[in-house]
UniProtKB/Swiss-Prot annotation:
Gene Ontology molecular functions: haptoglobin binding; heme binding; metal ion binding; organic acid binding; oxygen binding; oxygen carrier activity; peroxidase activity
Species this protein is from: Macropus giganteus
One GO term describing the cellular component: blood microparticle
Entry-annotated residues carrying Phosphothreonine: T12
Subunit structure: Heterotetramer of two alpha chains and two beta chains.
Protein purpose: Involved in oxygen transport from the lung to the various peripheral tissues.
SUPFAM superfamilies membership: Globin-like
InterPro entries: Globin, Globin-like_sf, Globin/Proto, Hemoglobin_b, Hemoglobin_oxygen_transport
UniProt keywords, alphabetically: Acetylation, Heme, Iron, Metal-binding, Oxygen transport, Phosphoprotein, S-nitrosylation, Transport
Positions of post-translational N-acetylvaline modification: V1
Name used for this protein in its record: Hemoglobin subunit beta
Length: 146
């Protein structure tokens, strides 16, 4: 994905303010609630029967944080997303058999969470940069599927 210097700056400056655990848990929780079929990949997480259970589930919160830590790796390697996510792509493709469309869904939910948390600070230009990033990450994660 091609990011301008301004877009890279918009991503990195906002990222430094992101509450990783809170935002990651919220994003994964929202994915499981808004797109309930995605919960089939998380059967071992215990109670995912309703929104309250999902958002209070410690395994959801922990895995969501892990997902955002991986986004942090992407932000450190904006010019090499495919290389950064090669092993995760292989894991999600070969072992977990995750539908790559789910990466796009989660990316969009991450953008929604950031917009909610940062309000007016999450400008249109910032959204453009983040949408490019989450699309690039989704593409990198789907790389092994091709």
């Amino acid at each position: 994905v091609h990011l301008t210097a301004e877009e890279k700056n918009a991503i990195t400056s906002l990222w430094g303010k992101v509450a990783i655990e809170q935002t990651g848990g919220e994003a994964l929780g929202r994915l499981l609630i808004v797109y309930p079929w995605t919960s089939r990949f998380f059967d071992h997480f215990g109670d995912l029967s309703n929104a309250k259970a999902v958002m209070a589930n410690p395994k959801v919160l922990a895995h969501g944080a892990k997902v955002l830590v991986a986004f942090g790796d992407a932000i450190k390697n904006l010019d090499n997303l495919k290389g950064t996510f090669a092993k995760l792509s292989e894991l999600h493709c070969d072992k977990l058999h995750v539908d790559p469309e789910n990466f796009k869904l989660l990316g969009n939910i991450i953008v929604i969470c950031l917009a909610e948390h940062f309000g007016k600070e999450f400008t249109i230009d910032t959204q453009v940069a983040w949408q490019k990033l989450v699309a690039g990450v989704a593409n990198a994660l789907a790389h092994k599927y091709h």
